[in-house]
Each structure stands twice: as C-alpha cells, then as structure tokens.
Amino acid sequence: MARKSLIQREKKRQKLEQKYHLIRRSSKKEISKVPSLNEKWKIHGKLQSLPRNSAPIRLHRRCFSTGRPRANYRDFGLSGHILREMVQACLLPGATRSSW
C-alpha cells in the first residue's frame, strides 16, 4: 500500500490541475494565435509562472484501493495485483479469467 503522504500529494496535484486548467488552456490557445515572437514569450512566461504541480503531465493514475501508481488498468481503476484478486473472488461483474 502506498504511503498516505504520497496519496495526499497526488490529491493536491489534482486540485491544482483543476484550478489552473482554464488558465493554462486559454494561454496555450493564445500562443497559437499570436503571430509575434515577443508576445509568445510573454504568454510563455505567464505559463511558467503557474505552479509546477498544476500541469496535467504531473498527475499519475493510482489504484483505487491501494494507491499503487504502477500497472493500473484504466477500465477498472485498479492495479493488476488487486484486479487479479478481485476477479478470482468474483467481485468484478463481467470479468472472466482467460483460458486457452
């Protein structure tokens, strides 16, 4: 299980990303529309002044039950280890084990 501080840090990043999402998106649209290089540099400086953790690239998917940041399945929101355990216990409807 992931440490509580790492899970809280990830939640803080999600809140920051939601808070600055519109500002970041509008600034990126402005950069593509402005023809002069000086204006682009000013807008780029505005983007750089935003908090680093507000960038969407810094977010990680985490397992819903354990908080593990690796080997996550998007469809379920679980890590592979927990997904396998839940399928074996028949806790996920519609999921079947493969056999060939």
Swiss-Prot record:
GO cellular component, one term: small ribosomal subunit
One Pfam family named in its UniProt record: Ribosomal_S14
Location in or out of the cell: Plastid, Chloroplast
Keyword annotations of the record: Chloroplast, Plastid, Ribonucleoprotein, Ribosomal protein, RNA-binding, rRNA-binding
Molecular function (Gene Ontology), one example: rRNA binding
Ribosomal protein recorded as keyword: yes
Location, primary (coarse class): plastid
Segments passing through the bilayer: none
One GO BP: translation
InterPro entries the UniProt entry points to: Ribosomal_uS14, Ribosomal_uS14_bac/plastid, Ribosomal_uS14_CS
Keyword presence, Chloroplast: yes
PANTHER family: 30S RIBOSOMAL PROTEIN S14, SMALL RIBOSOMAL SUBUNIT PROTEIN US14M
Family: Belongs to the universal ribosomal protein uS14 family.
Function: Binds 16S rRNA, required for the assembly of 30S particles.
Known partners and oligomeric status: Part of the 30S ribosomal subunit.
HAMAP family according to UniProt: Ribosomal_uS14_1
Annotated protein name in UniProt: Small ribosomal subunit protein uS14c
Gene name, Swiss-Prot/TrEMBL: rps14
